[in-house]
């Protein structure tokens, strides 16, 4: 029997929990990230199986939790092949038939299922719901809880992250702390730009690249997808948010946990003191640019001068904006957003620090 509900699927009082996964072994955001943290052994087995090409669309990859309380089974349901790609309805249809087989063969009494392929997967929820009802609706001996699309399961703040600091973790956490000290809220967008400017400062000081971030010219300026891994480690212990940081939108606010101020400061002044000059340079560089607009402007101009082969002139930078690699829509947005005075101010500041 199917029942529809909303909320946190991991709290469901059922024998089996369905976790939507890809076939490459990444649980980086949304409910999959929560599964990764709640059931680490499942993550280890699943990741190994992905390396061995054992996780495929249309087939459930099932592990047992071994817990006395809570669910017995974790049903890893592949809704994607690559984590960056969208789901396909045929993968949902085939997977539901394999899920049905599992429920019958194992005599499962209750199961909780998320909105398969909807949300991050890009599928239309009413279409997915119809497929679930068609495949499982006649299983009267199984209590099937269907969690409809909602942000509630994502908006559960992470209670704790890693405690061990590294130079990269300490530097990013300190950048966020300093930003708040200035009286400015710090968004995820701004952290991306701060990280870019820090990496550039480290380059200029000819120090070891502790961040190892792979930046690309994105919608709002330089963007590094792998920064999310670093932020996820800090999330819950050194940084806080109303939702999990990997699920946050560009303008969602991230703040520093002030209870960790002394610990971070001690680490930076001992193990990571080599990178303090780069941190100081970023603090001076962003003076007067402390806002989503200002940091996008500054980081975009810095990208064009350092990676886009532009000259430090207004005409050259504007031509670089016309050719912004993220696409015509985002190039036009930047040209509308940044006037000549803004651009010249940013050019002067970048040249002051990076000439």
Swiss-Prot record:
Residues 165-354 are annotated as: Interaction with DarT. InterPro entries: ADP-ribose_metab_enzymes, Macro_dom, Macro_dom-like. Gene3D superfamilies: Leucine Aminopeptidase, subunit E, domain 1. It is an enzyme of class 3 (hydrolase). It catalyses: an N-(ADP-alpha-D-ribosyl)-thymidine in DNA + H2O = a thymidine in DNA + ADP-D-ribose. Residues 14-155 form the Macro domain. Disulfide bonds: none annotated. ADP-D-ribose binds at residues 13-15, 20-22, 31-34, 79, 117-121. GO terms for molecular function: hydrolase activity. Residues 125-343 are annotated as: C-terminal domain. Pfam families: Macro. Its EC number is 3.2.2.-. Keywords: Hydrolase, Toxin-antitoxin system. The active site is at residue 80. Belongs to the DarG ADP-ribosyl glycohydrolase family. Antitoxin component of the hybrid type II/IV toxin-antitoxin (TA) system DarTG, which plays a crucial role in controlling bacterial growth and bacteriophage infection. De-ADP-ribosylates DNA modified by its cognate toxin DarT, which neutralizes the activity of cognate toxin DarT. Neutralizes DarT in vivo in 2 ways, by reversing the ADP-ribosylation via the DarG macro domain and by interacting with (and presumably sequestering) DarT via the DarG C-terminal domain. In vivo the macrodomain alone neutralizes DarT toxin from non-cognate T.aquaticus. The same domain de-ADP-ribosylates gDNA. This is DNA ADP-ribosyl glycohydrolase. The gene is darG.
């Amino acid at each position: 029997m199917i029942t529809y509900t909303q909320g946190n699927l991991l709290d469901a009082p059922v024998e089996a929990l369905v976790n939507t996964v890809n076939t490459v072994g990444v649980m980086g955001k949304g409910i999959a990230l929560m599964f990764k943290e709640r059931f680490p052994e499942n993550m280890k087995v699943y990741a190994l199986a992905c390396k061995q090409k054992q996780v495929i669309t249309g087939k459930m990859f099932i592990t047992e939790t071994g817990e006395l309380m809570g669910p017995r089974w974790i049903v890893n349901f592949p809704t994607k092949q690559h984590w960056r790609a969208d789901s396909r309805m045929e993968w949902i249809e085939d997977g539901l038939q394999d899920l049905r087989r599992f429920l019958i063969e194992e005599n499962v009494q209750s199961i909780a299922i998320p909105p398969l392929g909807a949300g991050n997967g890009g599928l239309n929820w009413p279409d997915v719901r119809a497929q679930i009802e068609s495949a499982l609706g006649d299983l009267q001996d199984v209590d099937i809880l269907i969690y409809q699309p909602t942000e509630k399961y994502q908006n559960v703040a992470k209670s704790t992250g890693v405690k061990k600091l590294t130079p990269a973790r300490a530097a990013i956490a300190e950048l966020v702390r300093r930003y708040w000290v200035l009286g400015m809220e710090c968004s995820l967008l701004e952290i991306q730009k701060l990280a870019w400017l820090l990496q550039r400062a480290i380059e200029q000081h000819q120090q070891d690249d502790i961040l190892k971030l792979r930046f690309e010219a994105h919608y709002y300026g330089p963007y590094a997808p792998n920064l999310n891994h670093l932020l996820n480690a800090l999330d819950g212990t050194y940084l806080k948010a109303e939702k999990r940081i990997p699920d946050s939108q560009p303008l969602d606010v991230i703040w520093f946990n002030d209870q960790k101020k002394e610990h971070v400061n001690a680490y930076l002044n001992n193990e990571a003191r080599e990178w303090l000059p780069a941190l100081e340079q970023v603090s001076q560089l962003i003076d007067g640019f402390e806002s989503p607009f200002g940091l996008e402007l500054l980081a975009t101009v810095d990208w064009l001068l350092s990676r886009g082969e532009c000259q430090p002139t207004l005409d050259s930078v504007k031509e670089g904006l016309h050719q912004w690699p993220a696409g015509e829509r985002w190039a036009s947005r930047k040209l509308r957003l940044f006037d000549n005075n803004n651009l010249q101010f940013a050019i002067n500041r970048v040249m002051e620090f990076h000439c």
